[in-house]
């Protein structure tokens, strides 16, 4: 499966992702980041709340399609 970041700047095979992390940063936004090498992390998506970020991260790991696109937030900013 290929994972596409929310802004479509990154496309990586899920097999290269060592782990993902959801953390609050970036002016209160919640970031979903993927570690693809021991010293390289990629921001996959930004969400206004932790729930959306955790849901998107979980859905990526459960996806059985050829591609996973991180959804845009449904919450108004």
List PLM regions with ranges.
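Eukaryotic intrinsically disordered, low-complexity regulatory linkers and tails enriched in Ser/Thr/Pro
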Residues: 1-77
């Amino acid at each position: 499966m290929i994972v596409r970041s929310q802004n479509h700047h990154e496309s990586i095979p899920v097999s290269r992702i060592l782990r993902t992390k959801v953390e609050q940063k970036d002016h209160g936004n919640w970031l979903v980041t993927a570690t693809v090498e021991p010293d390289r992390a990629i921001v996959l998506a930004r969400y206004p709340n932790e729930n959306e970020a955790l849901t998107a991260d979980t859905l990526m790991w459960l996806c059985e399609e050829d591609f996973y696109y991180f959804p845009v937030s449904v919450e108004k900013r």
